[in-house]
């Protein structure tokens, strides 16, 4: 069974835990209890493949920012979550993305931009803005509601598909026969 290490990042109060718990346990948590770090595992079938999702739900609060480098190192893909009624959380996405790229030492890291709380009538982040940001990053954008479950599976499953594409790309680039021992082609004798 293939395992995927997913990390949910974003500012405090955007609904990272609510999204994760909705996916794992099929229910909505409406009381806010700031997370330090929680880990969840769930077996799912995505596009016919049985997968084990290892999901790390992270702290949005600034006082836990020192822990970020560690989980960014181990994560394979990132759900970058903002709340559609919180412009600051949307602006913060760039900070998370830059930190992920720095820690991973790569511009090419599987990510999905997630606009949560789309069930709320008070929107301060326009869908068009979010689509444009995602397009500029070259990543998918999905609107979700942890309350109604809208887009929840789609967000996590899309991230798994992004990780699959990334793994294939890595496999193909290292499997083209040109790079062998010490950077030169290997010769079998």
Curated annotation (Swiss-Prot):
List the S-palmitoyl cysteine lipid attachment residues. 181
Q: Which Pfam families match?
A: Ras (PF00071)
* Control of this protein's activity: Alternates between an inactive form bound to GDP and an active form bound to GTP. Activated by a guanine nucleotide-exchange factor (GEF) and inactivated by a GTPase-activating protein (GAP).
**Which portions of this protein are annotated as coiled-coil regions?**
none
Q: Where is this region: Hypervariable region?
A: 166-185
**What Gene Ontology biological process does one annotation of this record name?**
Ras protein signal transduction
Residues bound to GTP are: 10-18, 29-30, 57-61, 116-119
Instruction: Name the predominant localization.
Output: membrane
Lipid anchor (S-farnesyl cysteine) at which residues? 186
Transcription regulation listed as a keyword: no
Reactions listed under catalytic activity:
GTP + H2O = GDP + phosphate + H(+)
- Propeptide positions in the record are 187-189
**Superkingdom field:** Eukaryota
Give the modified residues of type Phosphoserine.
89
Q: What does the entry's PTM section describe? A: Palmitoylated by the ZDHHC9-GOLGA7 complex. Depalmitoylated by ABHD17A, ABHD17B and ABHD17C. A continuous cycle of de- and re-palmitoylation regulates rapid exchange between plasma membrane and Golgi. Acetylation at Lys-104 prevents interaction with guanine nucleotide exchange factors (GEFs).
InterPro entries (UniProt xref): P-loop_NTPase, Small_GTP-bd, Small_GTPase, Small_GTPase_Ras-type
Top-level EC class as recorded in UniProt: hydrolase
- Glycyl lysine isopeptide (Lys-Gly) (interchain with G-Cter in ubiquitin) crosslink, residue number(s): 170
A single GO cellular-component term on record:
Golgi membrane
Keyword list (alphabetical) reads: Acetylation, Cell membrane, Golgi apparatus, GTP-binding, Hydrolase, Isopeptide bond, Lipoprotein, Membrane, Methylation, Nucleotide-binding, Palmitate, Phosphoprotein, Prenylation, Proto-oncogene, Ubl conjugation
User: How is the quaternary structure described?
Assistant: Interacts (active GTP-bound form preferentially) with RGS14. Interacts (active GTP-bound form) with RASSF7. Interacts (active GTP-bound form) with both SHOC2 and PP1c (all isoforms) to form a tertiary complex; SHOC2 and PP1c preferably bind M-Ras/MRAS, but they also bind K-Ras/KRAS, N-Ras/NRAS and H-Ras/HRAS.
Q: Give a short account of what the protein does.
A: Ras proteins bind GDP/GTP and possess intrinsic GTPase activity.
User: Which protein is depicted?
Assistant: GTPase NRas
Q: Which organism is it from?
A: Mus musculus
The gene name on file is Nras
């Amino acid at each position: 069974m293939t395992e995927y290490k997913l990390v949910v990042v974003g500012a405090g109060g955007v609904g990272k835990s609510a999204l994760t718990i909705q996916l794992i346990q099929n229910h909505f948590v409406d009381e806010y209890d700031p997370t330090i770090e929680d880990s969840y595992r769930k077996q799912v079938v995505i596009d016919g493949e049985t997968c084990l999702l290892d999901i790390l739900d992270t702290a949005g609060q600034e006082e836990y920012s020192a822990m970020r480098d560690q989980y960014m190192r181990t994560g394979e893909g990132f759900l970058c979550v903002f709340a559609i009624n919180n412009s600051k959380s949307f602006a913060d996405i760039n900070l998370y993305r830059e930190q992920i790229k720095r820690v991973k030492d790569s511009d090419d890291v599987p990510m999905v931009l997630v606009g949560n709380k789309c069930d709320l009538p008070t929107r301060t982040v326009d869908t068009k803005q979010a689509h444009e940001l995602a397009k500029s990053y070259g990543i998918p954008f999905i609107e979700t509601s942890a309350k109604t479950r809208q887009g929840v599976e789609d967000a996590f499953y899309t991230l798994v598909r992004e990780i699959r594409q990334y793994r294939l790309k890595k496999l193909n680039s290292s499997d083209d026969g040109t790079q062998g021992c010490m950077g030169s082609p290997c010769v079998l004798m």
